[in-house]
Amino acid sequence: MSVRLAVPDWSLLVPPLIIVGTIVLLLIVDAVLRRPPARLLLTLAFAGQVLALASLWTIDWAQGATTFGQSYRADWFALAVALVALIAGALSVLVSAGYTESGLDPEGIGQAEYLSLLLFSVLGTMLVGAAGDFIVLLLGLEMSAVAVYALTAFARRRVTSVEGALKYFLLGAFASAILIYGMAWVYGSTGSIVLRDIAETLRTVVMPGQPLDPALLLALLLLAVGLGFKIAAVPFHMWTPDAYQGAPTPVSAYMSVVPKVAGFAAVARVLVQGLQPLSEQWTGLLGMLAAITMIYGNVVAIAQRDLKRMLGYSAIGHTGYMLAGLAAFTTGQAGDRSVGSVLFYLFAYTFMNIGAFGVIAWLQERGLGTTLDDIAGLAGRAPLAALTMAIFMLSLMGMPPLLGFYAKYYVILALIEAGQLWLAVAIVVMSAVSAFFYLRVVTRMYFEEPAGALQPARTPVLGLGLALTTLATLVLGLVSSPILDLVQRWSAALA
């Protein structure tokens, strides 16, 4: 009897394969040229991601085709995640320009390794977005996370960098084990690891209004713990402030966005697609996590004096806002609005947060530290840098007509339509609380005397990254409605 093996459709994998090729090319160039120019490596890394972005439009995402069985899904949701991940990765390469051009490490850990790890994490995030089963989803999450563990410790001579990386790694390992345990319980209850098959099985066994089977309840709680760590939701956030503060600033910029994209993509795939019949249970759980997370993140950020640590707690608060968007999920078109609002938030957050960390990196290149005292009177020393930082702070706060305002507005709108008024009010109140620490940055820059002159430095590539993020923050809010309509249609792929 002859056996015919299924042939994978490699055309669906062109974007991630381009990233793989770019990683290999970076390492080959580094090995052949010994010490290649930093600009060459930056150009290769940036061009590879731009090429991968362009290749996204060669795939017919509307078909929702699968390959490798049902493990890899090329649907609209996968496109949305890949788009955000590649944009964030490309911007992070630009923001890293000053850091890589300095040589990173005189003992040999340098540019090629740094950029390869960054691209490896982008690749993992793309796999999470396209995951059709638990195996690919877990593989993508770990690819993304392990690379960031290493990047966090790149400033290995600084104790805070190694400490932050070690804490991130250890807690991440525990969280991954818990996540796998939760997946095992789902498999034991449904007999499948394929997300769509899990949903179909649950629709036949879960009755509305009936108590949930203890095995499924345990699985849901374990998955919530594991995924909660990936997105830095309270109380699974302990690694975040130390990792953000200790990591090199370009890594902090990247870490604040791409792992969060991977985490929320995993939450959407697992809960919205795989466990959709349990939405009555998990929307309530996400609502409570969202409220606790946004309150804790914004309140604790007020006490921070270090800008990177403040942005770490700010990131926790923004995780709460995005969780609130998922808590608004209901079946049908309203569910598309819920997931669409979160995708739009991630898109907006990419520009705002990478831009804010980019300004800090720009200041460090000129001899300043990362505390509030270091930026005192910045408007008198570097007026353009102060203006750029002020734009990002106001956008993160949610000031209209900047991009961050529309991100919060669409989440609040989804909550109101879902009848979750208390969470909508919580977002408004916490946004007002966040004004305290965001505006404090602005007032320190504009209403205090300069402490001294900046050291001269040439960082044109970093400047380009800041220009792009600033332009996006200012302009994309004005065309936010069609972007939201688009991502809402893409979110329907999870149904």
Curated annotation (Swiss-Prot):
It is found in: Cell membrane. Coiled coil: none annotated. GO terms for cellular component: plasma membrane. The chain crosses the membrane at residues 12-32, 40-60, 76-96, 117-137, 168-188, 216-236, 247-267, 282-302, 310-330, 342-362, 385-405, 419-441, 459-479. Keywords: Cell membrane, Membrane, NAD, Quinone, Translocase, Transmembrane, Transmembrane helix, Transport, Ubiquinone. It is an enzyme of class 7 (translocase). GO terms for molecular function: NADH dehydrogenase (ubiquinone) activity; NADH:ubiquinone reductase (non-electrogenic) activity; quinone binding. Its EC number is 7.1.1.-. It catalyses: a quinone + NADH + 5 H(+)(in) = a quinol + NAD(+) + 4 H(+)(out). GO terms for biological process: ATP synthesis coupled electron transport. It is a multi-pass membrane protein. PANTHER family: NADH DEHYDROGENASE (PTHR22773). Belongs to the complex I subunit 2 family. NDH-1 is composed of 14 different subunits. Subunits NuoA, H, J, K, L, M, N constitute the membrane sector of the complex. NDH-1 shuttles electrons from NADH, via FMN and iron-sulfur (Fe-S) centers, to quinones in the respiratory chain. The immediate electron acceptor for the enzyme in this species is believed to be ubiquinone. Couples the redox reaction to proton translocation (for every two electrons transferred, four hydrogen ions are translocated across the cytoplasmic membrane), and thus conserves the redox energy in a proton gradient. This is NADH-quinone oxidoreductase subunit N. The lineage of its organism: Bacteria, Pseudomonadati, Thermomicrobiota, Thermomicrobia, Thermomicrobiales. The gene is nuoN.
